[in-house]
Design a protein with these regions (language model features):
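A fold-level detector for beta-propeller and closely related beta-sheet-rich head/sensor domains
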Residues: 1-118
């Protein structure tokens, strides 16, 4: 599911909701699916162009969070910092709209950085 929710003959279309799948690198097994629950088949979220964040890059490069935007103007944080997969969560960190209320699509990956170790 995502931006292209078109269907081919004999296949079902996506639901248009933004999702991130965390996979086992060796086996390809799904460790966890994180679903924004935003979007629909007729108005897909188009979540794409994700950026991974690690404040511990000099130690072990463990990803602590993933950020991404969607075509509905939302910026998301997929927090992977918890010790168990059940503690991982999603937070909407911004919703970009015009003064008239129209969504401003996010079409590039977020640029991430640390400001004074915060």
């Amino acid at each position: 599911s995502g931006y292209n929710n078109g269907t081919d003959t004999g296949s079902s279309g996506g639901d248009g909701k933004g999702r991130v799948w965390i996979l086992n690198v060796k086996t390809g097994a799904v460790i966890r699916e994180l679903n924004t629950n935003v979007g629909s088949a007729t108005d897909p979220s188009g979540l794409a162009h994700l950026s991974a964040f690690s404040q511990r890059g000099d130690v072990d490069a463990t990803v602590e969070a993933v950020y991404g935007g969607d075509l509905l103007g939302n910026v998301w944080r997929f927090d992977l910092s918890g010790n168990t997969t059940s503690s991982w969560f999603i937070a909407k960190v911004a919703e970009l709209k015009t003064t008239g209320g129209s969504a401003q699509p996010i079409t590039t990956e977020p640029e991430l950085g640390v400001v004074q170790n915060k």
